[in-house]
From Swiss-Prot:
GO CC term (a single one): extracellular region
Superkingdom of source: Eukaryota
Species the sequence originates in: Heterometrus laoticus
Outcome, altering S46A: Slight increase in inhibitory potency towards Kv1.1/KCNA1
Disulfide bonds: C47-C64, C51-C60
Similarity-based family: Belongs to the short scorpion toxin superfamily. Potassium channel inhibitor kappa-KTx family. Kappa-KTx 5 subfamily.
Site (Key residue for potassium channel Kv1.1/KCNA1 inhibition): K58, K59
Name of the molecule in the record: Potassium channel toxin kappa-KTx 5.1
GO molecular function: acetylcholine receptor inhibitor activity; potassium channel regulator activity; toxin activity
Amino acid sequence: MKLLPLLFVILIVCAILPDEASCDQSELERKEENFKDESREIVKRSCKKECSGSRRTKKCMQKCNREHGHGR
């Protein structure tokens, strides 16, 4: 009978704490999002270079982004 409260506490703690798989999944999602953000930034910088000077128009930037797969 003395073990019953201890088992109950362990059960509650296990239910509250996230399991290892969900932690790994969250970390993977964060890494994937960071990769997407970095990729967008790289494309944005290269398009700014490509569309620099007098060619730097909204149309040029949109075309460049579409060609690199980041068009909206």
